[in-house]
């Protein structure tokens, strides 16, 4: 087997990894580069993916974040693409929601119609490859690592993952049952520049929100609409503190995709609505939200937890609601509000303002958790991707395992 990191050896996001065995090619992820990444005017030209003979090629998608799936519309339509079933539904809902304002999102919605889906932990084959999708916890729902086998070699491709989420507890058990050990691990290293960081578990963050909603009557949370765990965490925090929970129609559709729909998730009370206390949809007329007297009287009495997004629609609504002592929460990466960052979002900064509480935890693993996972897999060597500091990664782990640092476009034969 041969591994090529076409992109992602020294940057976060936009990763493209290739596994090749006897002419068969399996690619993992094909997404957009993040703001601040070393952009190139030239599109990637990868034989078997973007051009050339595709008869022995396929693409696996780890999850629906744009830096992992966002460029699939540029790929030839005959290329087979595979992703999780619920991840496809969420990605399709997002693309359809934005299709009225963007040609690219219309193209994405059309491309997703032809994407194949796999079943968690159910092994499938493609040419010489045996593939087992392993559910991992991430800030995108229905995210996957892949156990990829060919010619008696086993590689574990972690994708983006963490061990401090709601669904992280069974990862070790799943690894032991479905993977055991791996010859090589290709792993994300997003947080390598914070090696000592201990990230707040999602369940603790939910408790922090419960305390905040108890103390504060009027609450507005800015969170990604596809961060399913955070949405449900906010929902349950609101219900437990007897605060009405409000989302718009799109956010409600996203939550409905997950709520009680799948036997894997429905066992968890987190992804089920409390009877008689479902999320409330904001009233909308045309493109504007409506805050009538009945609604304002109700929230004046009971308070509210409102999930907001940037933009005038939400800003106008908030101006109509009671706001004495209102607290805004930023529950996403704070780099979006940092004018010195390439990802700075002026529209979000305007909506959130200067007076807010930062309540967030990373969608990526800390280095201690990564060390634990690699120890369980007991590989011959590890290959870092999805990192802006591969040398720091090597310094952290080289005493325990050989670390193979590849440049973009460089391959390693196992």
Residue ranges, per PLM feature:
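His/Asp/Glu-rich metal-coordinating catalytic cores
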Residues: 2-60, 66-229, 233, 239-240, ...
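Charged, glycine-enriched surface loops/patches
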Residues: 397-414
């Amino acid at each position: 087997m041969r591994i090529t990191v076409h992109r992602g050896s020294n940057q976060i996001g936009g990763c493209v990894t290739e596994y090749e065995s006897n002419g068969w090619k399996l690619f993992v992820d094909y997404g957009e580069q993040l703001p601040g990444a070393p952009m190139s005017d030239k599109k990637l030209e990868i034989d078997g993916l973007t051009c050339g003979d595709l008869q022995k090629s396929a693409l696996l998608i780890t999850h629906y974040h744009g830096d992992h799936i966002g460029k699939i519309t540029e790929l030839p339509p005959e290329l087979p693409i595979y992703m999780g079933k619920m991840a496809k539904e969420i990605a399709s809902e997002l693309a359809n929601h934005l299709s009225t304002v963007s040609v690219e999102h219309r193209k994405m919605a059309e491309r997703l119609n032809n994407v194949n889906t796999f079943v968690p932990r159910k092994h499938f084959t493609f040419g010489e490859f045996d593939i087992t999708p392993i559910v991992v916890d991430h800030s995108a729902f229905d995210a996957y690592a892949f156990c990829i086998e060919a010619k008696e070699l086993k590689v574990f491709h972690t994708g983006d993952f963490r061990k401090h989420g709601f669904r992280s507890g069974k990862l070790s058990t799943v690894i032991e049952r479905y993977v055991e050990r791996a010859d090589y691990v290709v792993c994300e290293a997003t947080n390598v520049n914070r090696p000592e960081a201990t990230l707040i578990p999602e369940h603790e963050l939910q408790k922090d929100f419960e305390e905040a909603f108890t103390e504060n009557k009027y609450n507005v949370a800015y969170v990604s609409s596809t961060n399913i765990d955070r949405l449900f965490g906010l929902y349950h925090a609101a219900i437990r503190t007897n605060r009405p929970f409000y989302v718009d129609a799109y956010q409600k559709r996203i939550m409905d995709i997950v709520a009680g729909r799948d036997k894997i998730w429905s066992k968890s009370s987190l992804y089920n609505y409390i009877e008689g206390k479902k999320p409330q949809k904001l009233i909308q007329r045309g493109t504007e939200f409506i805050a009538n007297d009945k609604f304002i009287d109700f929230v004046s009495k009971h308070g509210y937890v409102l999930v907001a997004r940037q933009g005038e629609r939400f800003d106008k609504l908030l101006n109509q609601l009671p706001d004495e002592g209102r607290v805004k929460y930023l529950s996403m990466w704070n780099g979006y509000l940092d004018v010195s960052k390439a990802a700075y979002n002026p529209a979000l900064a305007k909506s959130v303002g200067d007076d807010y509480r930062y309540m967030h935890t990373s969608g990526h693993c800390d280095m201690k958790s990564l060390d634990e996972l690699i120890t369980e897999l007991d590989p011959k060597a590890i290959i870092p991707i999805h990192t802006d500091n591969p040398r720091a990664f090597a310094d952290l782990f080289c005493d325990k395992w050989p670390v193979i640092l590849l440049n973009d476009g460089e391959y390693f034969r196992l």
